[in-house]
């Protein structure tokens, strides 16, 4: 089978869960069945890679369009890159797109090459209204591109049952076209790896427990709510915020002000690492952390929780989207329910209460080392049993085979 993967994120340009998903899924697809399949990846960037079962080519915009609103530049770049992708994606049996950035290209390839189109739902634009801060009115264009792609897709991979429900509710996709295939984790890479040198490098004390956040500074990831929870945490705990890549200058300022307030209002040591760290250092932080916190207000799946659990770290997370399909409340962590404003306006109705509830859950685990240890062991076991990339790649390949078979039958009819 010749598989086309279209994506905006691919190593080394990975900054979110979608990029992690594409990296590992692609690798596993290329390795399945003794290399009988060939995977062609077209990604935003300048990547270049070739092996008998995998070819990766980066695509960059050939020119820049002078946009009246600078926030529109990303959309224009995306459309040019998608046009280039659609011309390069040839000799395929199926095309698989990840995030709205590649949807225009996927729709073109479906029509030009007469092959089935698959989309993976890493997120849905209607659930991310704050993106208008980053894209301006181009947010409405990205939403239109996404809606058009879902209307044209032969198959949709939902990374959680919650996402399947959202796809059906928002875009009215036939449930028979949607298959739930969870995200996964590299069990060899993500496992407990102590490294006291990493703690020393960032000024994290080894004689006191710390609570960890890892992620981008975005509305979606809810980091502001965690920062606002710090003053309610037990004395003596450190807070490590491994948080960089702010979506906009405005949220960068908001984050800085929130951290300054937290430092002024509490006696806690707050370590803010303002960059996205390489995997080995993040794994060391997971390993040494007492608790990992995921305060997302919108999370279709949440690979980040799998990473922490694989490193035997208990999780406190918001009970939104696909997170409850990963974190078992009371077994591998604790879930906190933020009451959303509405089905599409996912920010908490009462932000202060959400912050207090996060702190209360963290305090429960801080006060009970035996419970933390039990959850840590169960977390690793759950990940091993249910979230291996090999299994996920095989499920995805099976979906491809079903879609190609149905497409072939329609052509013969």
Task: Identify the role of each PLM range.
Residues 1-49, 408-413:
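N-terminal subdomain of nucleotide-sugar transferases
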Residues 116, 127-148:
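Nucleotide-sugar donor phosphate/pyrophosphate-binding loop at the beta->alpha transition
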Residues 314-317, 327, 334-335:
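Short hydrophobic beta-strand element within catalytic cores of glycosyltransferases
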Residues 297:
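Aromatic "clamp/platform" in nucleotide-sugar-dependent glycosyltransferases that forms part
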Residues 162, 184:
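Carbohydrate-associated surface elements
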Residues 252-280:
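Nucleotide-activated donor-binding/catalytic signature segment of Leloir-type glycosyltransferases, i.e.
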Residues 284-289:
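Short alpha-helical donor nucleotide-sugar binding micro-motif in glycosyltransferases
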Residues 20, 209, 213, 218-232, ...:
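A conserved mid-protein helix/loop that constitutes part of the nucleotide-sugar donor-binding site
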